[in-house]
Design a protein with these regions (language model features):
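A short, structured active-site edge motif that brings together acidic residues
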Residues: 46, 130-146
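Surface-exposed amphipathic alpha-helices with a cationic face
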Residues: 97-104, 156, 174-178
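Non-catalytic pre-domain segments flanking phosphatase-related domains
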Residues: 1-7, 163, 219
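Conserved Lys-Pro-Asp/Glu-containing loop-to-beta segment of HAD-superfamily phosphomonoesterases
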Residues: 148-174
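Conserved phosphate-coupling serine/threonine residues in phosphotransfer and NTP-handling enzymes
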Residues: 12, 114-116
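Acidic, Mg2+-coordinating phosphoryl-transfer loop and its flanking beta/alpha structural elements
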Residues: 166-202
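N-terminal helical cap/lid subdomain that shapes the substrate entry/recognition surface
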Residues: 2-94
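Short, acidic loop-to-helix structural element flanking the phosphoryl-transfer center
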Residues: 83-112, 122, 149
Length: 219
């Protein structure tokens, strides 16, 4: 039976922190110029909630602002993220391409399941030519709920997946695996938290470790 791996994007494949602070600063500078924000950019608070869907992000970072301002801020933030990706400010984590090549050579299907928006995800996939390996990229924007477990369920149904593991750095990835009866592989990377990773079936410190894990998953 062929194996599938479903990857998170932010903090798992893509080093979001390379463009995060830059884009968030751009966004809050815009708010300051409009007299809608009067203090420093709340980067630390954003890091705490990294990985949640963007509507929840703006509820947390802009609790006193109207929905209209949050929507405008969301749109501007997305513009800045995409532009910073397109001009090469971001980076993949080490060994992404090597691992993807290995997985494809070993008949493993690769999918992305992310809380990121479609335009943002497409910018990453296109800039780094990840479509050479990825079967399809899925965004939480494509489903009614904002739960990653439901997004993973969509992938499983569409491709009739019988055997898979989810690779990600946050509890939402681990829970998505558990709720769908899949193996969870936690990534101990930049945004990971030890208390969350403790719930994963296994934990890696580098994506290259997937080359040794894959044969075990196939047993």
């Amino acid at each position: 039976m062929s194996q599938s791996l479903i990857f998170d994007m932010d903090g798992t494949l893509f080093q979001t922190d390379k463009i995060l602070e830059l884009s968030l600063d751009d966004t809050f500078e815009q708010l300051r110029s409009l007299n809608k924000w009067h203090t420093v950019t709340p980067i630390d608070k954003y890091r705490e909630i990294m990985g949640v869907p963007l509507p929840k992000v703006w509820e947390t970072l802009l609790p006193e602002h109207s929905d209209e301002v949050r929507e405008q801020t969301d749109a501007y933030f997305l513009e800045r993220l995409v532009e910073n990706i397109r001009i090469g400010k971001g980076a993949l984590y080490p060994n992404v391409r090597e691992v993807f090549s290995y997985l494809k050579e070993n008949d493993c299907s690769i999918y992305i399941a992310s809380n990121g928006l479609i335009e943002y995800l497409n910018a990453i996939v296109n800039y780094y030519d990840l479509d050479n390996w990825i079967t399809e990229t899925f965004s939480v924007q494509q489903i009614q709920t904002l739960y990653k477990a439901d997004l993973v369920k969509t992938i499983i149904r569409k491709y009739n997946i019988k055997k898979a593991a989810i690779v990600g750095d946050r509890l939402s990835d681990i829970n998505a695996a558990r709720d769908n009866g899949l193996v969870s592989i936690g990534c101990n990377f930049d945004f990971a938290r030890k208390d969350e990773l403790s719930h994963a079936d296994m934990v890696i410190d580098d994506l290259i470790e997937l080359k040794t894990i894959l044969p075990r998953l196939n047993k």
